[in-house]
Amino acid sequence: MPQESPIEFPAALPPELRELWSQLSEILTAFGDAQDRLDPPKIPEYADRLAPLAAALEKTVHAIDVTKLDRDAPAAVLTQSGVQLLGAASRFQGARTGPHEILKAFQALRPIARANDILFPLANRFVEISEHYLTPARRSDVSLRESLAKAAANPERGLMHFNNQRGHRGGYSLYVPENYTPDRAWPLIVALHGGSGHGADFLWSWLRDARAHGCLLAVPTSRDRTWSLHSPGVDAAGLNRMLDSVSGKWNVDAQRLLLTGISDGGTYSMLLSIVKQSPFTHYAPVAAAVHVLQNREGRVEAPVRDTRIYQVHGAVDWMFPVEKARAAAQALKDAGAAIDYREIADLSHNYPRDENPAILRWFSPELFESN
């Protein structure tokens, strides 16, 4: 009897799983849109969008008996991810009414990262899931998907966690593109979560861009509930150890080190930008209190001349008013910083993943030359 040929990955999902994946993909997209543009007045709108998607997914998930499946079987993995998403959708409905609607909404979205944790190991096995973890502009790139899948078995590639399990603080998560080779230097993105956040959650804000464009991605977790804004050296020591460890094992381009972050993470990135010995070459604070660098007269007297900054702020940010962001950007420019200020009309106090390509193009145009 002739042996069956081994399956070459990435392969198409089996027909019996395509409806489930279609539903997962649709609700993940809806959740992603909510995460990117969540604003208190928009919570009911997003809840209305999620409700029918969750109802359809729930029906499909409940029809699958996972007790009869191996834990790592694709059907079981997709179902486990679906359970996380259904929990998030249910909790999000509770954010329609107060008090503290925005806090409820943020808490409801936390299982999305766990759903991604479960799904991502299938990205290099199945075309549809691989496409989901790429930027829209790169999803049709067959050669990219194949190069990622062929090298996926290497234990020093892909997604790794270093003392960064949820519940632990002070560690970091690292993504090394599966098609990494040590014969050239690779750019590194370091992304800092917001207050009360965690690196293992925030990494999903950047992973598809790093995977699509060939960047290493390090996402640390602050030692305390947020970054050491009043004593920058506390968390800086951990960041330096992380950089030393990553650079010692992988070929990191010291001329392309991006430090970005959301809210407190963005504020902390700006505090590090004025440190003379900072190893970072570019800074991209998002929804941050950049005005902390200004003195009482509104001037920036810190050494920022020629510092490369891409500042992103939402016109409807409810935490840090946009007027302060505009004034800080002008003060940085007056002080000699090489600053690009990007104001997004419909952005509140969120991380806008759709701005990542522009940040990367500013950071390293070479990443787009062959795309």
Q: Where on the chain are the PLM-derived regions?
A:
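Gly/Ser-rich "nucleophile elbow"/oxyanion-hole loop immediately N-terminal to the catalytic nucleophile
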Residues: E178-R184, S228-S263
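Short substrate-entry loop that stabilizes the transition state in hydrolases
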Residues: Y180-S228, V292, W318
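Active-site loop/turn elements of alpha/beta-hydrolase fold enzymes
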Residues: S222-D224, A288, I344-D346
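Short, proline-enriched alpha-helix->beta-strand connector loops that line the catalytic pocket
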Residues: P303-I309, A335
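C-terminal catalytic histidine-bearing segment of alpha/beta-hydrolase fold enzymes
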Residues: V322-N371
